[in-house]
Amino acid sequence: MKTISLITRSFAVAAAIAGSAALGAEESKRPNVVLILADDLGFTDISPFGGEIDTPSIARLAAQGLSFSNYHTAGSCAPARAMLLTGVDSHRNGVPNIPEALPPEQLEYDNYQGVLNDKVVTLASVLQSAGYHTYMTGKWHLGQTPELLPSQRGFDRTIAMGDTGADNWEQRAYLPIYEQANWYADGVEHTLPDDFYSSEYFIDKTIEFIDSNASDDQPFFAYIPFQAVHMPVQAPREYSDKYAGVYDDGWTAMREKRRLAAIEAGVVPENTAPVVTPGTLDWNSLTDEQRRHHARRMEVYAGMVDAMDSHIGRLLAYLESIDEYDNTIFVFTSDNGAEGSDIITQDGGSVLAPWFERVGYNADYETLGERGSWNAIGPSNATIAASPLTYYKFHASEGGLRVPLVMAGPGIDRRNEISDEFVFVTDLMPTILDLVDVENHGGSWEGREIEPLVGTNFASYLSQGQSPIHEPTEPIGYELGGNSALFKGDYKIVMNRTGQGDTEWSLYDIKSDPSEAYDLAEQKPDLLKAMTADYDDYVAANGVLPMPAGYNRVLRILGPALLQLRQDRP
């Protein structure tokens, strides 16, 4: 186990540390919990992990707590959220894939419905039963029928968006697979205000919910799953313009800058190799206009991350004002790696252009990111967000699964450190319950049997540094949409069947080689054989289904809508 002390990167962060009381101060009541989940945030998109984007609020938490550079989640949003909130593998909690991507052959199985089933209990439900106020504001995407909304899964007060994503400026769908953007408040349909901007609104409502009970002695759990930085990537111009010119040298140059900065920050080893994800365009082969548009798309992306961090800062300031900051556990992470879908063309066009025209979206350079625009960074820019890792969202490669994790607050006695201990998304629920001294449900809830937690409680590591969190002989399996991995000690096997067309397993030492530059399959055949056998056991134990021949995720999600658009053309 290796930990690295974070060197304070700016006077502002140093001043924030000096001016704030220690986060671990003892209180007469249980600690509050604030769980902040970014959407499609890449590994080096925050400043503590080597990113150039200004994130002082997250940096403040990192400086006052412990960050994990070897934390892994799922490669797509709903399975990650389901495992985060239940501590149960996605094939057992009902969400092995997003419902929009599930093929018909798999929908015949109860554990392949794409919504939380009744065999799991959420972190919110357990905390609610222990006397916590429970609040959620943001993206849900775990079921939209009344019994599946967050108001029925343990949350007292909610503002929830039910789809894969939505516009950040107004209440409208962002893809033609939806008739409308589906929003709910406390379990009923909700209309957004005219001055809506997602990150601002979520923090406004979180503060409102907390403030409504601030005078009592009950602790609170606030779950804030931002839309940032899921497409459509949108941000107020004042945030995007801060990054004018930053990305003008292109993704190859910026990817290398981030790799070196990540090494300096201590989030990857010094010998981490540079990699080029297959399919990345040659920046120098593009026209000036194409480069200009790609750079602006990334400026808006940076602005959206910056805006999210700014609103997180408002929440931190509010908690200080009511004397709850020092008694609050903060957890910040992302649901999966950066989004690499190629919705927008190099010149600002789109495969969705007919639908854009119908509903009033545009991808114009001059207004990119503002109200009425539709923006995505695309696969080549996504390699910046994932740098120095390989690939991005949906893939089982490190760029899809490895994201930042920052924890601070009572019970997290280690300050200003980065740990390279392996942590998996299902580990967070049992750890949070231990930190607030609430009993694990143990596989039984309200007189019925439910799925037990499968994650490892690492609360003692947060205070005492006891390692390893996972024994080197413990296999941890993963599968989503045919893309598979298994972790064991420092090693990982991976096969991206539907992402890259892999037909053979690759083997990597991801502690020393996080960029997956050196395939060890031929050098360590016995280890590969043992780990593939472990994966087969995982498949059998968790009911993992094979993907049907010819499965294509994009066509499954968008195909019918694109076909309808063609048929509707005059």
Report residues per predicted region.
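Gram-negative bacterial Sec-dependent N-terminal signal peptides
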Residues: 2-23
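C-terminal cap/loop subdomain of S1 sulfatases and analogous C-terminal strand-loop tails that border
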Residues: 156-157, 161-167, 370-401, 412-510
